[in-house]
Amino acid sequence: WYDGLLSEWNNETAVQLGPDNYDTIGGWRIYEVTCDDPGLSKPAFLSSKLVEAPNAEEAAALDRYVERFVWGGLQCTEQEPYPYGIYGIPDWHVLRNSKDEDVRGKLHIWRIYDYPHIALMYYNLYRMRRLYPALPLSQSAETYLIRAARTLIAMFTIPLELDDWSAFGTGLYNELAAEDILKALEKESMPDLRLRLERLWNRK
């Protein structure tokens, strides 16, 4: 289930961290390996790096992460009840298979902090598609941009609906990507999506 995960290497123990071996991470903190800020900052960083310094092997790894780990796993697809929702801790596999049908299980998609990391990743994938069309990426530039915008829209709407957690009053890592995403939506002639995101962003 975690095929494509961007893993970390523990230099001290020479172990690659993953759901089959959390190494020195124990208890509830195992989330650090796959999700939350520790897990989701890695694709945000790698995608930002690839815009400035493209590398085909790294782009392929990021693409595998998106196609096999994020879309339909970590993040809800457009065919699910809450499109673009992002699963929280301990990991999406546990939550999707939970017997709890509510916000502590299958609807644990209310953590506002998770959304900007993934939105930034998609925005950078959009830029990579535009700047370096030869890189091995599975989706179109338009698809990545739409996902970036709709991930931010989901950040403002899904947590508020499910758990009364508002993204309007808290500063979030990587949320300033919204400014660039709005400019890109205007450039790509997506006025309806731009207006919807702009209303939410301006309110904040």
Show which residues each predicted segment covers:
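Catalytic cores of extracellular degradative/oxidative enzymes
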Residues: 1-204
